[in-house]
Amino acid sequence: MVEQIMIQGTASDAGKSILVAGLCRLFKNKGKRVVPFKSQNMSLNSFITATGDEMGRAQVFQAEAAGVFPDVRMNPVLLKPTNDRQSQVVFMGSILDNMDAVTYHDFKQTLISKIQAVYQSLADENDIIVLEGAGSPAEINLNDRDIVNMGMAKMVDAPVVLVADIDKGGVFASIYGTIMLLNEEESARIKGVIINKFRGDVALLQPGIDMIEELTKVPVIGVIPYANLKLEEEDSVSLSGKNYVPNSSALLDIAIICLPRISNFTDFHVLEIQPDISLRYIRNLAEFGNPDLVIIPGSKNTLEDMAFLEKSGLKKAIQHYAEKAGKVIGICGGYQMLGKKMLDPNQVESEQIEISGLGLLDTETIFLNQKRTTQITGVTLSGEPVEGYEIHMGQTKRGESTSPFCEIKAVNGNQETHQDGAVSTNKNIIGTYIHGIFDNDIFLGNLFNELLTLKNKTVYPHEIIQLKEHKEQEYDKLAALLEENIQMDQLEKIMKGEKICVSTQKPVIKE
């Protein structure tokens, strides 16, 4: 029979996704068949599986940590906000519809039996499932129809461990408040607490641990120290802490436009881990500076984000930068914005029908009702092998003054040839639909060398850090960190349904 543990949090960005990934790697290293599971994920960071199904990025990196291929069953429901009122609802990798919150709140009850069936299919194939909740289980206005926190735990009778982030302050209030807001049945499911992102001497924390255990009757089974692990961050909350000031000692300054509806910012994780590269996210004109490369990322609402560029003054700044031979790369929605105009006659993304783009590429985009979700392999026109994935509802037509960026050779593992993207005559403006383009080390190394040449500097002096190898190392570090700082014997008892005693829990943080 499958063993299971559910990680819920006191708030968003408490560390649930990372903790699930670490536990998946830890159990994998013990020889267990383990998979992650999140019934419903709200995110603009998504991935396309080998079968062309769309799922949340968090469950992808958790699957990588578990040593298994991403499977859409690990994230059956994906909600992709299109604006402040609506989300695109994706079930088992395919779009169902756009729904507002009230409509979806009623609709999701129809998904319960389907989610249970999906979960059972994973349970039949694995030894352990590590479940992840969303936000906080104490969203009491939504709990009557919850399918992702205590509602999910109840569906499969999973024990829960609550994780709380001490780095933001108020950790004991958040633990106590969360547990006290739950009804008796729900709070009884919480079998342990983990305090995350701790800095300092745990001896100073111990009196608080003793008090919270006495108040809640729930043991604290771990205190995880703050660790500077370089892992993907899925939650958009994490973007608020991203740097916008260039590092003057770095060889290259790369600026990413932080769009209000930015999607798939995980595309840029590989840039963050490269030595001598300053990567920053800019939100307004004052932060623009004089970068060596500007990247316009993907967007879940391209027309509204284009309007943001206009209103903020960033449109003119990017155009002026390009006129002075600056290098600009647009990914997916960013590619669409580089063109002359975008048309949305069916109002797929926005209430706007048409909007002018940056005009840096001779292209036009029309939005269609059908979404393209594919994994691809190909070769750039410069001869670099690339692979990645596409997620878009726009169809872009190139004009005569542009060249294609890439020749696609295979789609979802099947031979298929077509052209992707567009490149300006002077080669300084590049647009592509390929997410994960920077994960290709040959392409990335050549890009760095090109940018350094434009600055009259020598070639990039470092070997490109390959993302896959880097991730494997970080997953192992994460697993070791958890094993050292969580009372694993107590966690395993919880997973087996055994009762653990509050009075015996004395977590000791390891340096």
Curated annotation (Swiss-Prot):
It holds the Pfam family CbiA. InterPro entries: Class_I_gatase-like, CobQ/CobB/MinD/ParA_Nub-bd_dom, CobQ_GATase1, CobQ_N, CobQ_synth, GATase_3, P-loop_NTPase. Residues 251-443 form the GATase cobBQ-type domain. The keyword ATP-binding does not apply. One of its GO terms (biological process) is cobalamin biosynthetic process. The keyword Membrane does not apply. The active site is at 332 (nucleophile), 435. Keywords: Cobalamin biosynthesis, Glutamine amidotransferase. GO terms for molecular function: ABC-type vitamin B12 transporter activity; catalytic activity. Pathway: Cofactor biosynthesis; adenosylcobalamin biosynthesis. Catalyzes amidations at positions B, D, E, and G on adenosylcobyrinic A,C-diamide. NH(2) groups are provided by glutamine, and one molecule of ATP is hydrogenolyzed for each amidation. Belongs to the CobB/CobQ family. CobQ subfamily. This is Cobyric acid synthase.
